[in-house]
Amino acid sequence: MGCAMSRLAKMTTALVIIVMLFLPSAMAATVPSIDHTKSQRIPLPGGSGRGPESVAFDGQGQGPYSGVSDGRVLKWNGDELGWTTYTYSPDYKTDKCTLAALTPGTNRETLCGRPLGLQFHHKTGDLYIADAYKGLMRVGPGGGEATVLVDQVNDIPLRFTNGVDVDQITGQVYFTDSSMNYDRSQHELVTNTHDTTGRLMMYDPQTADVSVLQTNMAYPNGSPSATTRHTLWSRPPDRASCSGTGSEAPRQAQQSLLPTNRATLTT
């Protein structure tokens, strides 16, 4: 009896080892791979078409749309038409922004704007823009001059509006202000001084109200993902972590950190 139990234990151990050996490869086989040979490189127009930041597609799958360093948001219309101007801030002046290609970009940004985050509300066709200097903006279907929706919150100006996302069910807009002390041209100071004055906010297009969901954030960067409708994720650019904030109860929002492998994240 004891000998039989010993053989059974050995067989069980061997089976467990075999499963452990093959499980990683089996799991890896279920992860779809990306064929990079099918990717397409789309050059931006010369001159002022530099510094692409976020990329977005509209509800019909058209695009991509991308903000560039002269303050415009461009739309890709295919190989035949190429890039066209889709939207721009109310203060945008062609002669001082697009045609002033020799002027350093940071010198133009306060006038021309610097669109960083982009996201469409697919139901309405509205494009929401997180402009580093202008604040949260919106433009309707078809583009044109954008409208500034939020440029200050609780009487505190937005100094470094960065990321934006839209809840496609409710239409609520989530956006970040990376620092209350420094603007985009001083982004290195945000990192070097370990600034933690960043904010995560929500704009309600039905009421035009703005709620502050989280304060004292360290350089919230990129788009605060609202796709799960439970947690908003934002990643500081210099830290190997993601910041998660509950989105369904903004007045009771709690922030938590999720350690990550820096090599697997892009912003």
Language-model region placement:
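Beta-strand-rich domains and repeat architectures in extracellular enzymes and scaffolds
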Residues: 40-73
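Beta-propeller domains
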Residues: 28, 60-97, 140-142
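Short loop/turn segments that connect beta-strands within beta-propeller blades
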Residues: 77-81, 140-144, 203-208, 246-251
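Asp-box/WD-like beta-propeller blade repeats and closely related beta-sheet repeat scaffolds
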Residues: 100-116, 122, 126, 130-191, ...
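Blade/loop signatures of beta-propeller domains
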Residues: 10-41, 194-197
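Surface loop/turn motifs at the tips and blade-to-blade linkers of beta-strand repeat domains
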Residues: 42-48, 87-90, 107-111, 149-156, ...
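A short helix->beta-strand "capping" segment at the edge of beta-propeller domains
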Residues: 26-51, 96-107
